[in-house]
Curated annotation (Swiss-Prot):
Pathway: Carbohydrate degradation; pentose phosphate pathway; D-ribulose 5-phosphate from D-glucose 6-phosphate (oxidative stage): step 2/3. SUPFAM superfamilies: NagB/RpiA/CoA transferase-like. This is Probable 6-phosphogluconolactonase. Hydrolysis of 6-phosphogluconolactone to 6-phosphogluconate. It is an enzyme of class 3 (hydrolase). Transmembrane segments: none annotated. Its EC number is 3.1.1.31.
Amino acid sequence: MSEKKGALKVIPSASEEQLVQALGDLLQRCSQEALAKHDKFSVGLSGGSLVQLLTKALKSCNLKTAKWVFFFCDERYVRLDDSDSTYGAYRAEWLTQLPCIQESQFVRADTSQPLDACAADYEAKVKSQVDRFDLLLLGMGPDGHTCSLFPEQPATLQETKRLVIPIRNSPKPPPERITFTLPLINKARNVAFVVTGAAKASVVKSVFVDLDKKFPAAWVNPTKGQLTLIVDAGAGKEIETLK
């Protein structure tokens, strides 16, 4: 059974340039709103294609980022210098190309700890700095997963107390991870999915039009926040009714 989502804002992009501009505009708006109310702008990052897209957005937009703090919506349980590390991917891109970003602005997971302790420690770090995230930037896989919430592991969607949980036997390598849970995600002021590629067109429709709950991304519904979907022409080709 589908449940009605709150207001969804869809931003279609005909080109990568338009998508990067939309991402930059989103960052600017959310940053201005956050810094008008408190002394920092809290952002949750996701990996994959978002790393490059965000790098391009920040390079093309003249944004003041000194008061931005970056967390990770999920992280692979690997060494921070491993090629699979989401933190490592951002560090490699941003610290070499974006002089406005400092390493101290990243709040990273301590993957040297046992997996359960790593998740609990990261939850404590989140709680100590953030009540509600100002912006979470999420991707979505062709299987409808987001963060490290996978359709093959539906029990993760039922978590009600913990904000960060360990993941074992992930269907997508590497097998061990930590991830934000729905209570934390759905409390955010702004949640934005950034989805590209025609291979994801069908699941975009299933999640955002049909609200099919067999896909974890369909459970994302910020109850007191704004949900935004930024799509390129390929990913958005089956959702004309939402545009």
